[in-house]
């Protein structure tokens, strides 16, 4: 459960980053992480 909470916080931070910095690289990283999150 601990990992899930950390992931949620991490995703929140990433979304904030996405809003601040609209870059392709960050988007790609977020997508990879999102796919990994969906798998589990």
UniProtKB/Swiss-Prot annotation:
Membrane-spanning intervals of the chain: none
Free-text function comment from the UniProt entry: Acts as a pheromone, induces cells to develop competence for genetic transformation.
Entry annotated with the keyword Secreted: yes
Record keywords, A-Z: Competence, Pheromone, Secreted
Similarity comment: Belongs to the ComC family.
The protein, known as: Competence-stimulating peptide
A Pfam family the protein falls into: ComC
Molecular function as annotated in GO: pheromone activity
GO process annotations (BP): establishment of competence for transformation
Propeptide residues according to the Swiss-Prot or TrEMBL record: 1-24
Keyword Iron attributed: no
GO cellular component terms, A-Z: extracellular region
Taxonomic source organism: Streptococcus mitis
Primary localisation category: secreted
Subcellular location: Secreted
């Amino acid at each position: 459960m601990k990992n899930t909470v950390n992931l949620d916080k991490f995703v929140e931070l990433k979304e904030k980053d996405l809003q601040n910095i609209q870059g392709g690289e960050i988007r790609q990283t977020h997508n990879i992480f999102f796919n990994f999150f969906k798998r589990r």
